[in-house]
Amino acid sequence: MRKGNEEKNYREEEYLQLPLDLIVEILKKLPLKSLVRFRCVSKQFSTIICSLRDFIESVVTRHLAQPGQQLPLLAVFHHCVPETFFTVSSSFSQSLKPAIYNPTTKRSVGLPEIGPPVTGFRKCNCLFGYDPVMDQYKVLSMVFDFRELTQTFHVFTLGQSQSWRRIQGINDGKLFPSAVGICIDGTFEFLRFKRDQDCLFCDNETQHIII
Protein backbone atom coordinates (compact mmCIF):
# COMPACT_ATOMS: atom_id res chain seq x y z
CA MET A 1 0.00 0.00 0.00
CA ARG A 2 2.82 2.39 0.92
CA LYS A 3 4.59 1.68 -2.34
CA GLY A 4 1.43 2.51 -4.28
CA ASN A 5 1.06 5.85 -2.46
CA GLU A 6 4.71 6.72 -3.14
CA GLU A 7 4.28 6.01 -6.84
CA LYS A 8 1.10 8.14 -6.90
CA ASN A 9 2.82 11.07 -5.17
CA TYR A 10 5.77 10.82 -7.57
CA ARG A 11 3.44 10.91 -10.58
CA GLU A 12 1.59 13.94 -9.14
CA GLU A 13 4.85 15.83 -8.51
CA GLU A 14 6.05 15.04 -12.00
CA TYR A 15 2.74 16.21 -13.45
CA LEU A 16 2.69 19.46 -11.45
CA GLN A 17 6.25 20.45 -12.35
CA LEU A 18 6.06 23.28 -14.88
CA PRO A 19 8.76 24.50 -17.26
CA LEU A 20 10.78 27.44 -15.95
CA ASP A 21 9.80 29.78 -18.79
CA LEU A 22 6.11 29.10 -18.11
CA ILE A 23 6.55 29.82 -14.39
CA VAL A 24 8.26 33.10 -15.23
CA GLU A 25 5.45 34.14 -17.58
CA ILE A 26 2.82 33.34 -14.94
CA LEU A 27 4.66 35.31 -12.27
CA LYS A 28 4.96 38.31 -14.60
CA LYS A 29 1.17 38.64 -14.61
CA LEU A 30 0.84 38.86 -10.83
CA PRO A 31 0.46 42.08 -8.81
CA LEU A 32 3.54 43.37 -7.00
CA LYS A 33 2.22 42.52 -3.55
CA SER A 34 1.55 38.94 -4.63
CA LEU A 35 5.11 38.63 -5.91
CA VAL A 36 6.42 39.77 -2.53
CA ARG A 37 4.42 37.05 -0.77
CA PHE A 38 5.40 34.37 -3.30
CA ARG A 39 9.12 34.79 -2.60
CA CYS A 40 8.75 32.27 0.25
CA VAL A 41 7.12 29.58 -1.92
CA SER A 42 10.46 28.08 -2.94
CA LYS A 43 14.09 28.95 -3.61
CA GLN A 44 13.30 28.94 -7.30
CA PHE A 45 10.52 31.52 -6.87
CA SER A 46 12.75 33.67 -4.67
CA THR A 47 15.56 33.61 -7.25
CA ILE A 48 13.22 34.51 -10.11
CA ILE A 49 11.50 37.36 -8.26
CA CYS A 50 14.56 38.86 -6.57
CA SER A 51 17.51 38.12 -8.84
CA LEU A 52 16.39 37.51 -12.42
CA ARG A 53 17.15 40.86 -14.12
CA ASP A 54 14.95 40.33 -17.19
CA PHE A 55 12.02 39.35 -14.98
CA ILE A 56 12.44 42.39 -12.71
CA GLU A 57 12.68 44.81 -15.65
CA SER A 58 9.59 43.27 -17.27
CA VAL A 59 7.53 43.58 -14.07
CA VAL A 60 8.60 47.19 -13.49
CA THR A 61 7.83 48.14 -17.11
CA ARG A 62 4.38 46.55 -16.94
CA HIS A 63 3.62 48.22 -13.61
CA LEU A 64 4.61 51.69 -14.83
CA ALA A 65 2.57 51.25 -18.02
CA GLN A 66 -0.65 50.76 -16.06
CA PRO A 67 -2.99 53.79 -15.77
CA GLY A 68 -2.36 55.88 -12.69
CA GLN A 69 1.09 54.41 -12.06
CA GLN A 70 3.13 57.44 -13.17
CA LEU A 71 3.79 58.51 -9.60
CA PRO A 72 6.08 61.25 -8.33
CA LEU A 73 9.25 59.91 -6.72
CA LEU A 74 9.49 62.64 -4.13
CA ALA A 75 9.15 62.94 -0.39
CA VAL A 76 9.91 65.99 1.72
CA PHE A 77 11.66 65.37 5.05
CA HIS A 78 9.16 65.00 7.91
CA HIS A 79 6.28 64.86 5.46
CA CYS A 80 4.53 61.77 4.12
CA VAL A 81 3.49 61.59 0.47
CA PRO A 82 1.05 58.64 0.29
CA GLU A 83 1.07 58.50 -3.53
CA THR A 84 4.77 57.72 -3.79
CA PHE A 85 6.03 54.23 -4.55
CA PHE A 86 9.27 54.92 -2.74
CA THR A 87 9.56 57.44 0.08
CA VAL A 88 12.59 59.19 1.47
CA SER A 89 12.43 60.39 5.05
CA SER A 90 14.64 61.52 7.90
CA SER A 91 14.44 60.73 11.59
CA PHE A 92 12.50 62.86 14.08
CA SER A 93 15.76 64.34 15.39
CA GLN A 94 15.80 66.62 12.31
CA SER A 95 19.17 65.27 11.22
CA LEU A 96 19.72 64.98 7.48
CA LYS A 97 20.00 61.20 7.59
CA PRO A 98 17.42 59.90 5.12
CA ALA A 99 16.16 56.38 4.52
CA ILE A 100 14.53 54.82 1.47
CA TYR A 101 11.45 52.78 2.31
CA ASN A 102 9.68 50.40 -0.06
CA PRO A 103 6.01 50.03 1.02
CA THR A 104 5.62 46.88 -1.08
CA THR A 105 8.46 44.88 0.50
CA LYS A 106 8.30 46.71 3.87
CA ARG A 107 12.08 47.14 3.72
CA SER A 108 14.18 50.25 4.23
CA VAL A 109 17.74 51.30 3.47
CA GLY A 110 19.42 53.91 5.65
CA LEU A 111 21.69 56.48 4.02
CA PRO A 112 24.54 58.56 5.50
CA GLU A 113 23.87 62.04 6.82
CA ILE A 114 23.82 64.78 4.19
CA GLY A 115 24.89 67.70 6.35
CA PRO A 116 23.97 69.77 9.43
CA PRO A 117 20.53 69.30 11.05
CA VAL A 118 17.55 70.92 9.33
CA THR A 119 16.56 74.20 10.98
CA GLY A 120 13.54 76.41 10.57
CA PHE A 121 15.32 78.25 7.77
CA ARG A 122 16.37 75.22 5.73
CA LYS A 123 14.41 72.66 3.78
CA CYS A 124 15.51 69.45 2.12
CA ASN A 125 13.82 67.61 -0.74
CA CYS A 126 14.95 64.26 -2.10
CA LEU A 127 14.35 62.49 -5.39
CA PHE A 128 14.83 58.77 -5.90
CA GLY A 129 15.44 57.39 -9.37
CA TYR A 130 17.01 54.77 -11.60
CA ASP A 131 19.83 55.37 -14.08
CA PRO A 132 19.23 52.87 -16.95
CA VAL A 133 22.59 53.64 -18.57
CA MET A 134 24.69 52.73 -15.52
CA ASP A 135 22.08 50.34 -14.04
CA GLN A 136 22.17 52.21 -10.73
CA TYR A 137 19.66 53.58 -8.25
CA LYS A 138 20.43 57.10 -7.05
CA VAL A 139 19.12 59.69 -4.62
CA LEU A 140 19.32 63.41 -5.37
CA SER A 141 19.03 65.79 -2.40
CA MET A 142 18.26 69.50 -2.68
CA VAL A 143 18.82 71.59 0.47
CA PHE A 144 17.40 75.11 0.29
CA ASP A 145 18.53 77.83 2.71
CA PHE A 146 15.82 80.49 3.00
CA ARG A 147 18.07 83.00 4.76
CA GLU A 148 20.98 82.79 2.34
CA LEU A 149 18.72 82.07 -0.66
CA THR A 150 21.08 79.32 -1.76
CA GLN A 151 20.59 75.70 -2.67
CA THR A 152 23.04 72.79 -2.54
CA PHE A 153 22.81 69.48 -4.38
CA HIS A 154 24.18 66.06 -3.41
CA VAL A 155 23.90 62.63 -5.04
CA PHE A 156 24.10 59.22 -3.39
CA THR A 157 24.50 56.03 -5.45
CA LEU A 158 23.03 52.93 -3.81
CA GLY A 159 25.32 49.94 -3.53
CA GLN A 160 28.49 51.92 -4.22
CA SER A 161 28.64 55.22 -2.37
CA GLN A 162 29.70 55.55 1.24
CA SER A 163 29.00 59.27 1.25
CA TRP A 164 27.09 61.97 -0.62
CA ARG A 165 28.71 63.57 -3.68
CA ARG A 166 28.40 67.36 -3.92
CA ILE A 167 27.23 68.63 -7.32
CA GLN A 168 28.89 71.85 -8.46
CA GLY A 169 28.21 74.35 -11.21
CA ILE A 170 24.43 74.82 -10.90
CA ASN A 171 24.10 78.58 -10.56
CA ASP A 172 21.62 79.70 -13.22
CA GLY A 173 18.45 79.86 -11.14
CA LYS A 174 17.24 77.95 -8.11
CA LEU A 175 15.01 74.90 -8.10
CA PHE A 176 11.65 75.50 -6.51
CA PRO A 177 12.00 73.74 -3.13
CA SER A 178 8.43 72.40 -3.02
CA ALA A 179 8.22 71.20 -6.61
CA VAL A 180 7.21 67.59 -7.26
CA GLY A 181 9.53 65.87 -9.70
CA ILE A 182 8.64 62.95 -11.93
CA CYS A 183 10.84 60.51 -13.83
CA ILE A 184 10.14 60.36 -17.58
CA ASP A 185 12.21 58.10 -19.84
CA GLY A 186 15.01 57.91 -17.30
CA THR A 187 15.28 61.65 -16.58
CA PHE A 188 13.90 63.81 -13.77
CA GLU A 189 11.70 66.75 -14.66
CA PHE A 190 10.60 69.41 -12.20
CA LEU A 191 9.99 73.14 -11.88
CA ARG A 192 12.60 75.72 -11.07
CA PHE A 193 12.38 79.49 -10.86
CA LYS A 194 14.45 82.51 -11.77
CA ARG A 195 13.96 86.03 -10.56
CA ASP A 196 11.84 87.12 -13.50
CA GLN A 197 10.11 83.96 -14.72
CA ASP A 198 9.19 80.34 -14.11
CA CYS A 199 10.51 77.65 -16.40
CA LEU A 200 10.72 73.89 -16.73
CA PHE A 201 13.97 72.20 -15.79
CA CYS A 202 14.72 68.84 -17.40
CA ASP A 203 17.68 66.66 -16.56
CA ASN A 204 18.54 65.69 -20.12
CA GLU A 205 21.82 64.40 -21.50
CA THR A 206 23.45 67.83 -21.44
CA GLN A 207 22.75 68.18 -17.71
CA HIS A 208 23.36 64.56 -16.77
CA ILE A 209 25.75 65.65 -14.02
CA ILE A 210 22.80 66.25 -11.67
CA ILE A 211 21.88 62.59 -11.67
From Swiss-Prot:
PROSITE patterns: FBOX. Residues 12-59 form the F-box domain. SMART domains: FBOX. Signal peptide: none annotated. This is Putative F-box protein At1g52490. It comes from Arabidopsis thaliana.
